[in-house]
């Protein structure tokens, strides 16, 4: 009997010590938006980031449109009186763009791997009060990744962006390439995580694939015009929405599936 009483008291003390789930969550960047939308109850979400309704940046824009977005974050956060603010870490235990307040803060760095995405899902799920929901999301993503078809073709790919910027190693895009059986051209050229590669150097390198953002297919300025050079146009393209790769999150599986399918279906050179 004594043991039961002690166990009951211990359980009560742990429950009492745990903070109540937040009732007013504010997200300060698009990356945090994805986690909040996937893991929090709708009634818990007070506001999303300024770009929460931007289809080029938000992978969950259809769901996000139900919620207000911030226009002047510093002012509006104070007015909203949230009990949890999520965004990029500021290096001092706070969140970038969050004014001082008594609310809890969770800083999430940019996820550069599926392992980081899993960890962040766990963090967000725990702090919003739905750890089981986070576990289910992780399990579902792992199951979907395990079910992806084995890549049929390898090759060298370059994630080439407007103004000649190429995404390098140690990034989310680099891991997605490797998952699709592709070698990142940046690794072969010894480039860092982000480097500007002149058009002439890209033409000389002749990768087997160019991975481009869907939004860059239209020529809107000189930065996008270079992606339409005749030699580059002859290289098979893998088109991926920027919203799938700008942040780590639940869209990781969609990005991996799409890259594998497009690489396998591309014409041989």
Where are these regions (language model features)?
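Bacterial Sec-dependent signal peptides at the C-terminal "C-region" and cleavage site
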Residues: 12-22
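Structured C-terminal subdomain patch of bacterial secreted/periplasmic proteins
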Residues: 23-24, 115-126, 135, 213-269
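A short, structured surface patch at a secondary-structure boundary
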Residues: 24-80, 84-94, 182-185
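Basic- and aromatic-lined ligand-binding clefts that recognize polyanionic substrates
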Residues: 24-36, 132-180
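Short secondary-structure boundary segments
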Residues: 29, 89-90, 162, 189, ...
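His/Asp/Glu-enriched short active-site or ligand-binding loop at hydrolase and phosphoryl-transfer sites
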Residues: 49, 55, 172-194, 236-239
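Short helices/loops that flank or line small-molecule/ion binding pockets
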Residues: 74-82, 196-206
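Extracytoplasmic ligand-binding site segments that recognize negatively charged/polar headgroups
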Residues: 93-96, 109-123, 156-175
């Amino acid at each position: 009997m004594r043991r039961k009483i002690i166990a009951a008291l211990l359980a009560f003390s742990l429950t009492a010590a745990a903070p109540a789930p937040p009732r007013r969550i504010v997200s300060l960047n698009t990356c945090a938006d994805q986690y909040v939308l996937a893991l929090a109850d709708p009634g818990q979400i007070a506001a999303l980031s300024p770009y929460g309704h931007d289809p080029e940046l938000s992978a969950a824009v259809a769901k996000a449109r139900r919620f207000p977005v911030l226009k002047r974050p510093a002012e509006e956060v104070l007015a909203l009186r949230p009990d949890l603010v999520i965004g990029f870490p500021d290096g001092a235990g706070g969140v970038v763009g969050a004014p001082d307040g008594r609310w809890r803060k969770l800083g999430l760095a940019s996820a550069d791997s599926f392992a980081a995405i899993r960890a962040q899902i766990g963090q967000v799920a725990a702090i919003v009060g739905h750890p089981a929901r986070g576990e289910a999301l992780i399990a579902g993503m792992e199951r979907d990744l395990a079910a992806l078809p084995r890549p049929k073709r390898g090759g060298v790919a370059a994630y080439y962006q407007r103004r000649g910027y190429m995404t390098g190693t140690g990034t989310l895009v680099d891991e997605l390439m490797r998952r699709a059986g592709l070698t990142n051209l940046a690794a072969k050229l010894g480039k860092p995580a982000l480097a500007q590669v002149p058009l002439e150097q890209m033409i000389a390198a002749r990768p087997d694939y160019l991975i481009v953002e869907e939004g860059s297919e239209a020529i809107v300025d000189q930065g996008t015009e270079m992606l339409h050079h005749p030699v580059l146009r002859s290289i098979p393209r893998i088109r991926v929405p920027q919203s799938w790769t700008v942040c780590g999150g639940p869209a990781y599986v969609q990005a991996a599936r799409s890259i594998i399918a497009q690489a396998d279906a591309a014409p041989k050179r």
